[in-house]
A protein has these predicted regions:
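Generic recognition of flexible, low-complexity loop/linker segments
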Residues: 27-28, 38-42, 218-226, 232-234, ...
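Short linear interaction motifs
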Residues: 35, 211-219
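Non-catalytic, conformational "gating/processing" segments within enzyme and secreted inhibitor domains
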Residues: 216-251, 439
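Conserved short beta-strand edge segments in small beta-sheet-based binding/regulatory domains
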Residues: 148-152, 261-264
Length: 467
């Protein structure tokens, strides 16, 4: 198409904004108490499959427990329990379920980056006729895992560390984005405990494994006991009446042996400070360069126009400045409704040039000017991801996101309308907001040791990436 004239391109049929659906879908789930536990049902035809999600809130943990909570999710299902070897657990899971997973995650408040809901999410799916077997397995793993086998523990830690070592550089952008946001966002600081900080925690445990083994086993058992209590639990299933009934009927298999625990609803984590503006030295030849800040702290508000701006930056400014001129594989933005925002380049041969491109971005927005046809294309391109068909489990997850973040139907409706009605003036009006983000002092880079050392005056700290 690059050889075509503007006139020829303009003859290609294009949707108009009036073709876009303005209404967002209603999202609701039924809520009741079952044996004193909050039970949510997301009604959706799942063709006889029960999707079961157990959310254990982590408010009762201390900051120093959090790395052990992340470690725990790697260990569950991979160590023996009171009644089964870990090989048997795998066999039972493969026979009767479509898979089970354990993960620490958090849901950030829609407006305030100091608030979030930290959870351990235990997810499983099974044919509804096997829901009882799946729930027995969950109960066994959550309530009866034995953390006593030192040899097996070392094996799991070594596998986990090896997998981090292999993927460290490839997921460089994810690591620097999380590390960067942890400088200015308490919500991101929690997630960062499962990112680069977790890799360093893991490395330290292995390095001192012989003297720390007993301590590690005790901490894992204590952390599991603090997390897996009835008071922390919220149950959600996705399905119809049969699925709901199966979960209610067999809930005892999960909670029968689970202690009541203490109710706790306040966040009190204080994580160790890492310092800011770090450069992580690696043997690779390219950089991941991230810069960001929080615009709500500077008095700006999130609007749907930011989503359109992200599309425009991806295909216009960042594409041309950082990919075409700079030679990087790519660059992208992350903007959250709570004001946490960042720019990040991917496999980038440059460093200070990229930071300069970020700094000059607001100026580009101030003078933003394209044809109405192009603008409509960007609006349609922004809407496309929202039109993806969701699977039943994805719909269930969306309902949980809304519940935990405080996002309402009206919030979603408003953003959708702001996207569809977005004008070039709206994009130009974002220059001040983006200026506040790129003028904040925060950045983080992972890249070539030579390159970072040559520009070491940029950084507050240079650290070796691998341990």
């Amino acid at each position: 198409a690059s050889g075509e004239t503007e006139e020829a391109l303009a003859t290609i049929p294009l949707l108009s904004r009036s073709d876009l659906k303005r209404e967002v879908e209603e999202v609701s789930q039924e809520e009741e108490k079952v044996q004193g536990i909050t039970h949510l049902s997301y009604q959706e035809n799942t063709s006889g499959i029960t999707y079961l999600n157990l959310f254990f809130t982590l408010y009762g943990l201390k900051a120093e427990d959090v790395p052990y909570a992340y470690l725990l999710t790697t260990i569950l299902g991979s160590m023996d329990t009171d009644n089964h070897t870990y090989q048997e657990l795998t066999r039972i899971s493969n026979t009767y379920t479509g898979g089970m997973s354990y993960a620490i995650t958090s849901y950030d408040d829609k407006a305030d980056n100091t608030k979030y809901v930290p959870v351990c999410a235990v997810r499983g799916k099974a044919l509804t006729s096997n829901a009882d077997k799946m729930m027995q397995l969950m109960g066994e793993v959550l309530n009866h895992t034995r953390f006593t086998d030192t040899g097996r523990l070392r094996e799991i830690l070594m596998e986990e560390k090896a997998s981090w070592d292999m993927s460290l550089f490839d997921r460089g952008h994810a690591l620097v984005m999380m590390r960067l946001m942890s400088y200015y966002s308490p919500a991101a600081q929690f997630k960062e405990q499962g990112s680069l900080s977790y890799y360093y925690f893991l490395s330290d445990l292995l390095e001192h494994f012989d003297e720390k083994a007993e301590h590690i086993k005790a901490r894992l058992a204590e952390t599991a006991a603090k997390i897996f209590t009835r008071k922390n639990l919220i149950v959600q299933e996705v399905g119809l009446k049969e699925e709901k009934q199966a979960v209610v009927n067999h809930l005892d298999a999960v909670i029968g042996d689970m202690p009541e625990g203490e109710a706790c609803h306040t966040l009190s984590f204080v994580f160790p400070e890492t310092g800011i503006n770090e450069g992580f030295l690696s043997s690779g030849k390219v950089q991941y360069v991230a810069k960001g800040g929080n615009f709500v702290k500077h008095g700006f508000k999130f609007t749907g126009a930011l989503r359109v701006m992200e599309t425009i930056l991806r295909y216009e400014y960042l594409w041309k400045r950082i990919r075409v001129l700079g030679g990087a594989y790519g660059a992208f933005t992350r903007i959250a409704t709570n004001g946490d925002a960042l720019l990040c380049s991917y496999r980038d041969p440059n460093l200070s040039e990229t930071l300069k491109a970020y700094k000059e971005l607001p100026e580009y927005l101030r003078h933003f000017n394209i044809s109405e046809r192009e603008m409509t294309k960007y609006v349609i391109g922004t809407m496309a991801p929202a039109e993806t068909q969701l699977t039943p489990s994805m719909k269930g997850e969306r309902a949980m996101v809304m519940r935990f973040t405080g996002q309402t139907h009206d919030d979603r409706q408003k953003v959708r309308e702001q996207i569809i009605d977005c004008t070039q003036e709206d994009i130009r009006a974002l220059a001040g907001l983006m200026d506040s983000v790129v003028s904040d002092k925060y950045f983080c880079v992972l890249g070539s040791e030579d390159k970072l050392k040559a520009e070491s005056n940029l950084f507050d700290h240079l650290r070796s990436l691998t341990k």
